[in-house]
């Protein structure tokens, strides 16, 4: 994909690949704060639901906030890579969600038990797709080194 980007952007994303990959997973991070996909905790789940706009909120406001905030920070290239990854997640969700929903059931089912099962299947399928694409790129989850990026600067 890097070859299809303007050269300076491709080089920036290559230089800050960890930040890019971290951004590409960030919208779903709070979904993973669960013992199993079947036991999502409401407090963590609501954060990702809000980031995805499922609460009826505008799901792009925080992106504009991040872009505005980035202008005031040191190491703008690292934050740009993170935001580019974040936007790639949104693009992938836009493309893949119709298929994921059709395979996993009604995410908003009126029956709480079926809704819980559908959401668990949704997360398992998305995680499987993530891991498949990661393996196709020749990378491993451990090799991304994302945990080293969890230090948030004080000025953020």
Task: Describe the predicted segments one by one.
Residues 3, 85, 152-156:
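Short, intrinsically disordered, charge-balanced linker/junction segments flanking boundaries
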Residues 80-88:
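Short, glycine/charge-rich beta-strand/loop segments that flank catalytic centers
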Residues 1-81, 94, 99-148:
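N-terminal, motif-rich segments that launch catalysis or mediate targeting to/interaction with membranes
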Residues 87, 91-95:
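Active-site His/Glu-centered metal-binding helix of metallohydrolases
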């Amino acid at each position: 994909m890097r070859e299809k980007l303007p050269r300076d952007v491709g080089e920036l994303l290559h230089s800050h690949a960890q930040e890019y990959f971290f951004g590409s997973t960030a919208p779903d991070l709070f979904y993973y704060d669960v013992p199993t996909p079947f036991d999502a905790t409401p407090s963590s789940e609501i954060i990702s639901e809000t980031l995805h706009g499922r609460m009826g909120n505008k799901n792009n406001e925080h992106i504009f906030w991040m872009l505005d905030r980035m202008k005031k920070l040191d190491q703008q290239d690292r934050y740009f890579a993170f935001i580019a990854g974040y936007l790639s997640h949104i693009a992938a969700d836009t493309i893949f969600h119709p298929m994921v929903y059709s395979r996993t059931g009604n995410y908003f089912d009126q029956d709480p038990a079926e809704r819980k099962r559908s959401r668990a299947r949704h997360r398992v399928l998305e995680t499987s797709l993530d891991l498949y694409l990661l393996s196709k790129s020749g990378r491993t989850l451990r090799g991304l080194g994302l945990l080293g990026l969890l230090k948030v600067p004080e000025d953020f």
